[in-house]
Each structure stands twice: as C-alpha cells, then as structure tokens.
Amino acid sequence: MDHQLKQLQDWISESRHIVFFGGAGVSTESGIPDFRSVDGLYHQKYDYPPETILSHTFWEENPEEFYRFYRDKLIVKGAKPNAAHLRLAKLEQQGKLRAVVTQNIDGLHQAAGSKTVYEL
C-alpha cells in the first residue's frame, strides 16, 4: 500500500493535466448520504426508488413528493467540504487539476474552491 501511495504522489507531482472523476464516496465524509451503501438511499423504504424520484418526469408529475424527498434526503445542513474536496481545489489552484467530474450535486467541490466542476 505504501508503494502505491508513493506512486500516486509521484504521478500527481509530475502531472499538469489531471482530471478527477468522483462520486458519492468523496462527500460521505462530509455527512452526505450515498445511494448504494448499507445505509444508502437505495436501502431506505420509499414508494419509489431514488432514481425514479430524481427523474425529470417524476418532478413534473409529482413535484411535492420530489421536493419532500430532496429536502429530507439530499440537503444536509451544515455539510462542509472535507480534506478530499480541499485537496482537489488546491491542485486546481496549483495548475495541476484541469477539472472535477462528479456525480455529486452537493456543491461541496465548489465550496472548497474548485472552479471547473462538471456535475453529472
């Protein structure tokens, strides 16, 4: 493991065109729930699965239910960027990181200072 970590550090120090691809694992340290873990949103009981509730069609047909789910499960008051968010922002400021591509829609990358963030 130490060898792998050292290799990653070397790659980062030598690189100038890093693109970070991330997902829920980055923000779980900030208290944001994920979808697939044991405690994730997929394992909680709702009338619909999360991917249905978060669809455009569901929003059009059931706006009250959509906003209730969003408010209750996706907005985490007090969530702050964690060490990963902050380190990625620092790499961008250093000119090493070109972009963050993420499945997260929590805004924590931007709150940490990242400018080029693509939320999928």
What are these regions (language model features)?
Residues 1-120:
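Conserved catalytic core of sirtuin-type NAD+-dependent deacylases
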